[in-house]
Amino acid sequence: MYKRQTPEEALAILSNNQNDKQKRIDTVLQEGYPSYTTAAGWLGYSDEKIIQLCREYMAKGWKHFKIKVGLDLDADVKRLELIRKTIGDDCFIMVDANQQWNVEQSIKHINAYKKFNLFFVEEPTSPDDVMGFAKIKKEVGNVRLATGEACGGRIMFKQFLESGAMNICQIDSCRLGSINEIITVLLMAHKFNVPVFPHAGGVGLCEYVQHLCMIDYILINGSKNDKVVEYQDSLHEHFIYPVSYTHLTLPTRRGG
């Protein structure tokens, strides 16, 4: 890893953010950290249910909606048209294909979605195919590609970042295995100027992720601009201090 980021470079990043660290702590205590919802557009939902859920989540304050795609291009376009009409142009749409396509299919589908001004496209193809992602990126222009939830260590992230194949880094705090490995990836992503949007689609991951996005914002990256973290409304009732809607909050109690 020293070829990509030396200990001295990592220390410099952490040191440079010390001066206004308290200001960022105060900001997240007051405002929280913005999130996006994955609940409005699962595959198999009827048009009526999608409209209902989009309106419900907009009423709760969400502006970012992640939609599942990948089974049928025409059906995907129809659903995206419906969602864009429902949420308007002031809200954001991102799509997740869950590795449904090969490289050529990915290029075809993503180019067909461009008119919807997508916030990002997540996992269009195999999460191990770094060169495939690089080819997709070359062919789809300024559409941002998000991946990383299936990466089990910093070396995979190194390859994605070095190749320019990853525009949004989606760490998964369980697959990476330790906070030390996570911080290594956060520092590396910052060096490559790639924002980190942690994956949180699992039991307890939202509760873990709220700590990680605060670490990234307060100590490493120093900015929340154009960033959101995944929120999935799943089994939060089993936690003493569950995460809140729309903006994840800085824990104020032990175990929070």
What does each model-found stretch correspond to?
Residues 43, 128, 152, 176, ...:
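A broad, structure-centric signal for solvent-exposed, well-ordered loop/edge residues
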Residues 38, 170, 230-231:
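Structural signal for conserved beta-strand scaffold positions within catalytic alpha/beta enzyme cores
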Residues 43-48, 140-142, 217-226:
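Short, charged helix-to-loop "capping" segments that act as catalytic/coupling loops
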Residues 1, 12-16, 111-113, 142, ...:
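Short, charged low-complexity intrinsically disordered segments located at boundaries
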Residues 3-93, 98-107, 111-116, 241-248, ...:
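N-terminal capping/lid subdomain adjacent to the active-site entrance of alpha/beta enzymes
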Residues 67-207:
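Catalytic core of soluble alpha/beta enzymes
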Residues 180, 184-185, 202-248, 253-256:
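Flexible C-terminal active-site loop/helix
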Residues 26, 122, 176, 226, ...:
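Generic secondary-structure boundary/loop-capping signal
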